[in-house]
Amino acid sequence: MNVAYVGSLVPAKGFDLLASAWPAVLAKVPDAQLFVVGSGKLYNRNSVLGKWNIADEKFENKFMKHITNDNQVLPSVHFLGVLGEEKNDLLLKCRVGVPNPSGNTETFGFTAIEMQSMGCNITTMKCSGYLDTVFTKRYLYYNSNNLAKNIIKLLLQKEHDYNEVYSFIKQNFSFDKIVLEWEQLFKEALPGHKLLHPYSIKKNPFYRLKFIKLGLQGMKFRFNFLNQLPTIEYFLQHSWDKVLWHINNK
């Protein structure tokens, strides 16, 4: 009943969301174990860590209160620091992987690929990168309040489509596949080409109004004055996202 988090322990990577969900997971799955691979020093070895030597003091204070008791880390939580390839041995023993629960700053999310290739089921924020890299999308959430519920379901489920997941990764993210896509990108980036990604509309066209964004991208090549207009993402962040937040937090 193991759960894994792999990543930097900084606010942008959202570990605090997983920590706050952990007590609810334990309430339903008492033998669940959380393995945390990473550190506040992952990307900056000169960072000053807090009391627990895990993350920045302010960030530690935000998440440690959820996973400590009597000033001791819960027995079910294991901080392993920064690991190399040996983390794969750990992931092979985990049922659930939770990469960046906040989804912030993610454009691809390679950790999700690593976790799935080792047999982990994924639950995390429904955002651009993970829509492409996560095979089973029904456990991607808009609201982090669903994180604990998703972890519990994945820990308790009896069946897992390992073969389909592995085929998905091999077909979409193998070395041979990615090298050809880079070659295609460089060729299409030559001067005079209308779009760098004319085929990208095929994937998740309605997410964040992607089909409109790509349509405008083509028009902006022809009509420069359109570059002065607010972006579609700006519109979403200042209208639709706020509506969703109020609905989810009622």
Which residues does each PLM region occupy?
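Conserved donor-binding/catalytic core segment of Leloir-type glycosyltransferases
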Residues: 1-13, 19-23, 34-37
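Nucleotide-activated donor-binding/catalytic signature segment of Leloir-type glycosyltransferases, i.e.
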Residues: 47-82
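Short acidic alpha-helix that forms the nucleotide-activated donor recognition element
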Residues: 64-69, 84-94, 117
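Acidic donor-binding loop of glycosyltransferase active sites
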Residues: 92-107
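Short glycine/serine-rich donor-binding loops of glycosyltransferases
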Residues: 109-112
